[in-house]
Amino acid sequence: MKQDFYEVTENEQIAPSVFKMTLAGDTSPITAPGQFVNIKIPEFYLRRPISICDWNDKSLTIIYKAVGDGTRAFGRIKKGEKLDLLISLGNGYDTSLSGDKPLLIGGGVGVPPLFGLCKKLIAENKTVNVILGFNTKSEIFLEDESYKVICTIVSKQNSL
């Protein structure tokens, strides 16, 4: 675990009430997909835990749904602002247990941590299939990014 300030380089809405935020800073403590961060919001006492969607040497990406006062406040954060984060929380996924042809299943805001997991499994030369579920067509996110790296089946509860 590491506490530090990270600069917001992107915070954009990607689906109804769903936002993608990229934060620049030291990501070296992140060791596995599936880990999360705890973010301090200036006007709130408690930090908000958000799973890490993806990361590289210089930044990390989170995807969050604005459902309460805290996550709605995230939506008002502007590019260039600095946020206090605790990073590299949780154990993450142990890919040694996945076998050669893992099937990943997730829905809604459970989808983001699967993106980093899928990238790691592919880097390990595993054949990955993913099933993503969403309530409506308008709520689908990461579809374009997912198709670049994986075979994906996207389902939704309502009809097209």
Q: What residue spans do the PLM features occupy?
A:
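Ferredoxin-reductase
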Residues: 2-81
